[in-house]
């Protein structure tokens, strides 16, 4: 098994593909979403784990490095996404990826590391459907702070549009 920097990994599409193989039915990551979210990663905190040329895990770390300063954000690092394929779990790979990411974030100077809820995030934290993973993070020093919820509005409500607001033009 080899760990390499994410920016040096040439098959980036396999990152969201292995995620989607397990979680795509509830938390799909499209190519567009993935590419948008890795634009602002912290390279020194983002890695992939490869075994015989096959991607088996990854971690994506972020720090605030936008030109617009937000008070307190310079003290925060984020673990945007972390994953190890089922076959390779319970072998210390996730722990190694997490540790490498955390060490890079600490070296950068952050004093708080959040799981998720980064800007341009995939998740606002640990998804409720993945609650079985929570003890793994707690064992590594992460604390449950609060729960967030997705809110849904149904769009099947009838909307009335009056013709006097629009001018209809025919193709003739």
Where are the predicted features?
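Alpha-helical elements of Rossmann-like donor-binding domains used by nucleotide-donor carbohydrate transfer enzymes
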Residues: 14-18, 96, 100, 132
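Conserved acetyl-CoA-binding loop-helix of GNAT-fold acetyltransferases
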Residues: 84, 90-106
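A conserved beta-turn-beta hairpin within the catalytic core of GNAT-like acetyltransferases
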Residues: 65-79, 89, 108-111
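A short, internal acetyl-CoA/4′-phosphopantetheine-binding micro-motif in the GNAT/acyltransferase core
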Residues: 79-89, 118-120
């Amino acid at each position: 098994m080899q760990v390499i920097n994410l920016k040096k990994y040439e098959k980036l599409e396999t990152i969201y593909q292995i995620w989607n193989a397990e979680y795509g039915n509830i938390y799909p990551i499209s190519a567009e979403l993935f590419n948008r979210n890795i634009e602002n990663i912290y390279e020194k905190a983002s890695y992939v784990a490869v075994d015989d040329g096959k991607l088996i895990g990854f971690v994506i770390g972020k720090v605030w490095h936008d030109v617009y300063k937000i008070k307190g954000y310079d003290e925060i690092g984020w673990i945007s996404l972390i994953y190890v394929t089922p076959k390779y779990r319970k072998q210390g790979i996730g722990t190694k990826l997490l540790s490498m990411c955390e060490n890079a974030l600490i070296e950068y100077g952050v004093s708080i590391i959040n799981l998720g809820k980064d800007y341009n995030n995939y998740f606002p934290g640990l998804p409720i459907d993945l609650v079985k993973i929570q003890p793994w993070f707690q064992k590594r020093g992460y604390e449950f702070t609060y729960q967030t919820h997705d809110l849904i509005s149904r769009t099947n409500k009838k909307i009335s549009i009056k013709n006097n607001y629009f001018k209809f033009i025919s193709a003739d």
